[in-house]
């Protein structure tokens, strides 16, 4: 079935460039479109042509809709209400004589393997979820009752660490929570010049440094560290004064599914979630909601299901075909371009605000 889906994507891509009568298609695309048009035209009263003439826009836009929706129906039991599908579309796309491009087949392979792929993913949210409360920055707090380092969270990503005079503190177990999926993180440390102790402002010690594998790290310079293998130590050389630093985690990496499965996925997502007009907004919203995806924004978590990734790929190519022929039809209405653009902007804002 991978070849069947690759043929459907190849046909949609070929139909997208058919809007330009001067386009020069590669041999594979030319053969795909020729054979598909020949087989498809024998099963319908609305034939599709390789170079559609003026007035045939309804044919060229309904053909990719049939291919895309039929592919979704085959893979995910998707049903489009009020739409009568050509039952021969599936049989035509399943014929071995219709070629497909290597790029489309490679993308289909990525859709299938998405749920089994694990890679190093960058994140910048809260690294220290075990800190349930935060304290005010600069306030000197006593050591914990049970002993241990004087380390407190002042934000979701920043820790405030006190160190007594002439002491060393190993920071690796403090800055990396006990999470198996954390691979490495990037930090920035800064020395606190003064703080508040007993309702009075006091100067903090200045002779303090942070060591990464026994090498000094300059304050304000980003450095990388790992939970295992790299030792991060805070050393105080002050004879009397207390030293305090702020350690901020700017980003970290964990193992998880990738957000981008194939090469053109980011461009496809942008095309799918672009407001074109009311018809496209309704079609896109219905298909995505039927597959359990948001209608007006891409999911915040990575998409690993084959059917959802396939829907993104198919809808993006339907958007290319639809935009190509809608653009050619609206270019004839030049005196009304400004009114048409203002109307589209108002409709887009209304659709996104209402969350249709």
Curated annotation (Swiss-Prot):
Protein's cellular compartments: Virion
UniProt xrefs under Gene3D superfamilies: 2.60.120.170, Bluetongue Virus 10, subunit 1, domain 1 (1.10.250.10), Bluetongue Virus 10, subunit 1, domain 3 (1.10.170.10)
Keyword Glycoprotein carried by entry: yes
Glycosylation sites: 41
Gene Ontology MF term list: structural molecule activity
Keywords associated with the record: Capsid protein, Glycoprotein, Outer capsid protein, Virion
GO CC annotation: viral outer capsid
Family: Belongs to the orbivirus VP7 family.
Protein name per UniProt: Core protein VP7
Naturally occurring in which organism (per UniProt): Broadhaven virus
